[in-house]
Amino acid sequence: MGINQWEQAEPGVKRKIHSPGNEVMMMEVVFEEGAEGSSHSHPHEQLTYCLEGKLAFQIDGKEVLLEQGQSVHIPSNAVHGVKALMPSRLLDVFTPLREDLLN
């Protein structure tokens, strides 16, 4: 996994981790229509901004629709997943650093 390089994350989903700071990092994620990010959780706090498209997030059992220009906060340890309702692109911001993605 390389910094500033696109990689396949899941079927229909690719991501690029941008160069991280000391305590915060960004990751761009592109979804084909119908592609899903499987449910997971992590101790990191996350902000997700929709650059384009429309997605349905499940965050701790609640559905949140996210469209271009909108953002959502995903608290630490919240179980979350997402499905793209159309081709979509997100910018995820994490703090502290996601060492699991960087190593």
Predicted regions and their residues:
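Structural motif
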Residues: 54-56, 63, 79, 89
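Ligand-binding loop in jelly-roll beta-barrel domains
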Residues: 76-100
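Glycine- and acidic-residue-biased ligand/ion/polar-headgroup-sensing regions
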Residues: 44-45, 49-55, 60
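Histidine-centered metal-chelating micro-motifs
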Residues: 36-37, 56, 72, 76-81
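A short, N-terminal "cap"/entry segment at the start of jelly-roll beta-barrel domains
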Residues: 1-23, 103
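Conserved short histidine dyad/triad with adjacent acidic residue
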Residues: 27-41
